[in-house]
UniProtKB/Swiss-Prot annotation:
UniProt GO molecular function: signaling adaptor activity; small GTPase binding
Subunit structure as annotated in this protein's UniProt entry: Interacts with CDC42 (in GTP-bound form). Interacts weakly with RAC1 and not at all with RHOA.
Phosphoserine modified-residue sites: S43, S52
GO cellular component: cell projection; cytoplasm; cytoskeleton; phagocytic cup; plasma membrane
Domain notes from UniProt: The CRIB domain mediates interaction with CDC42.
Function summary: Probably involved in the organization of the actin cytoskeleton by acting downstream of CDC42, inducing actin filament assembly. Alters CDC42-induced cell shape changes. In activated T-cells, may play a role in CDC42-mediated F-actin accumulation at the immunological synapse. May play a role in early contractile events in phagocytosis in macrophages.
Subcellular localization, as worded in the UniProt entry: Cytoplasm, Cytoskeleton; Cell membrane; Cell projection, Phagocytic cup
GO biological process, one term: phagocytosis
Record bears the keyword Lipid metabolism: no
Protein name as it appears in the record: CDC42 small effector protein 2
Length: 84
């Protein structure tokens, strides 16, 4: 027995092409507006423990502009990635 395929073009909608994201180059990016430098934070500051993290948060909040945040309890597990 053979198969017979009949295609109805009127019933099949053409699939929309995915939109390509516009490529951004450096000339499209302007200078920051309303920028306020509040703190220096390095990877060593975060790995020294939770006391350091809370002191960094307190320092940044004392500079202003962080009043709209919400408090959250966070537990972090530190993993040493040094090759030994």
């Amino acid at each position: 027995m053979s198969e017979f395929w009949l295609c109805f073009n009127c019933c099949i909608a053409e699939q929309p092409q995915p939109k390509r994201r516009r490529r951004i180059d450096r000339s499209m990016i302007g200078e920051p507006t309303n920028f306020v430098h509040t703190a220096h934070v390095g990877s060593g500051d975060l790995f020294s423990g939770m006391n350091s993290v809370s002191s960094i948060q307190n320092q940044m909040q004392s500079k202003g502009g962080y009043g709209g945040g919400m408090a959250a309890n966070v537990q972090m597990q530190l993993v040493d990635t040094k090759a030994g």
